[in-house]
Amino acid sequence: MAGAVSEARFAGLSLMQLHELLEDDAQLGDMVRGMEEAQTVQLNKEMTLASNRSLAEGNLLYQPQLDAQKARLTQKYQELQVLFEAYQIKKTKLDKQSNNASLETLLALLQAEGAKIEEDTENMAEKFLDGELPLDSFIDVYQSKRKLAHMRRVKVEKLQELVLKGQRHPQAGAPPPPRVPEPSPATALPYPSLEATGLPSVVPRRIPPPPPPVPAGHVATPFAAAMGSGQVSAYPGLQCPPLPPRVGLPSQQGFSAQLVSPYPPALPQRPPPRMAPHQPGFILQ
């Protein structure tokens, strides 16, 4: 609605009037402040400021209580420091006493105090029976002392249990003395079986048998001569026939001279070519 009114207002102005309106800041400010949206924003702003002021005034009412709580917190913190220092001092004293005194000493002292309070209660009961104490004072004092006696008796029993446990634990936890191994005769360790190791069996090498003796008139083999055993293999000596006599030369017995062939050595012959096997349907020529 306000936008339509503004458009209608600006539509009736000429170009010169529009230029003058742009140059006049005061008139533009009045026009903006007169708009409904600007008035709504201003109203919300004033209401927000008023609510903030009221909240601030309400918070100021709690200022005395806040100051009192701060002072109380400071006092409690100082008391805490004092108590902590006292705790540290007492803890140090207790540690020194616990280091100096053992459980047996504490047990003896507590038993002495327990016996003393028991004796006091018995004496009080005798005085009451003799009529030296009135009933009212006897009931109050006797009840408190009997309560203290029972508490000390329970503490003595608990402390005795602790002492017994402390005596048992070191004995149970002490390691046994080391055992000195007795000397034993050195025995050869058996080798593991071949089935357990999975290795193939090794057969020892046999010694070759000696060759048979060579009778007279036989020739020794080169193997026997290389072994140097003095034993030769039995190979019979070769009996070669005598060579035929040549014309004009005397005949000779045995192998006095090396036989020389009058013919040149034969050349090595090439082996014949291999023929393909006979196959049906082909004629070989």
UniProtKB/Swiss-Prot annotation:
Compartments in which it is found: Late endosome membrane
Feature: compositional bias, Polar residues: 250-259
Family: Belongs to the VPS37 family.
Protein name from the UniProt record: Vacuolar protein sorting-associated protein 37B
Subunit field text: Component of the ESCRT-I complex (endosomal sorting complex required for transport I) which consists of TSG101, VPS28, a VPS37 protein (VPS37A to -D) and MVB12A or MVB12B in a 1:1:1:1 stoichiometry. Interacts with TSG101, VPS28, MVB12A and MVB12B. Component of the ESCRT-I complex (endosomal sorting complex required for transport I) which consists of TSG101, VPS28, a VPS37 protein (VPS37A to -D) and UBAP1 in a 1:1:1:1 stoichiometry. Interacts with CEP55. Interacts with IST1.
One Gene Ontology MF term: calcium-dependent protein binding
UniProt region (Interaction with IST1), positions on chain: 50-170
